[in-house]
Amino acid sequence: MVKILGVIPARYASSRFPGKPLVKIGDKTMIEWTYRNASRSTALSELVVATDDTRIHEVVQGFGGNSVMTRADHISGTDRIIEVANLFSEYSIIINIQGDEPGIEPELIDGVAGLKASHPEWKMSTAAVPLIDFSHGEDPNRVKVIIDRNGKAIYFSRSLIPSQFKQTVPLYRHLGIYGYDRDFLLKYNSLPKSNLEESESLEQLRAIEAGYGIGVYLAQEAGLSVDTPADLEVVIEDFKKRKWIT
């Protein structure tokens, strides 16, 4: 049986929203909401928060979650995931779950994990949703992905892809969740940085340009993420509608 580890990277020192993981949504912190919703996934064998901040570490331990302290000098979230993968050698698949999506649906995690487990020829998996609002296609903060007939990513871009010259194919928005083969993840940083990665500022293009496959799970809808205090207010209203908070 394949053992799958879910990892939630959590930083306190966010430039746009310092202390973001510890902001309250109702009576719980955002990191607790993310952890509890992610823990509903049936695919994960274990779930852990990876942080370089003792405040986050103590909060996670306080609500009964698993947390590990990582180095503070990591350049990216992937670097933090790699450090954790080295600590948990018994897991063959690692799922990188964003810590700023408190309402994450467990089905999304299950889909990404299941796709990776069923396609060992693909070294990574991720997710996307149909891009319904055409105006979002022009937003560079909403990454787009082209997917082939087998469900594998062809390319990721901040630009609108593919061209809508004839509007014959659907548009897909990429979601920031990743599944990795553990062995591939551990050698990821040894892959040469690609020109495409630098141009788009999208780390996953390193794998694409090196010739590795990334499978794409198609989700029904995107969850709400929190990048700014304004985003937090939107999430709070959404949670009230769900009757998760009052």
From Swiss-Prot:
Q: Reaction(s) catalyzed by this protein?
A: 3-deoxy-alpha-D-manno-oct-2-ulosonate + CTP = CMP-3-deoxy-beta-D-manno-octulosonate + diphosphate
Q: Could you say which EC number(s) this protein's record lists? A: 2.7.7.38
List the GO cellular component terms.
Answer: cytosol
Give the keywords, sorted.
Cytoplasm, Lipopolysaccharide biosynthesis, Nucleotidyltransferase, Transferase
Molecular function via GO: 3-deoxy-manno-octulosonate cytidylyltransferase activity
The cross-references to InterPro entries, in alphabetical order and at most eight, read:
Cytidylyl_trans (IPR003329), KdsB (IPR004528), Nucleotide-diphossugar_trans (IPR029044)
The free-text function statement in the UniProt record for this protein reads: Activates KDO (a required 8-carbon sugar) for incorporation into bacterial lipopolysaccharide in Gram-negative bacteria.
Give the protein family.
Answer: Belongs to the KdsB family.
Q: What is this protein called?
A: 3-deoxy-manno-octulosonate cytidylyltransferase
Q: Which organism is it from?
A: Leptospira borgpetersenii serovar Hardjo-bovis (strain JB197)
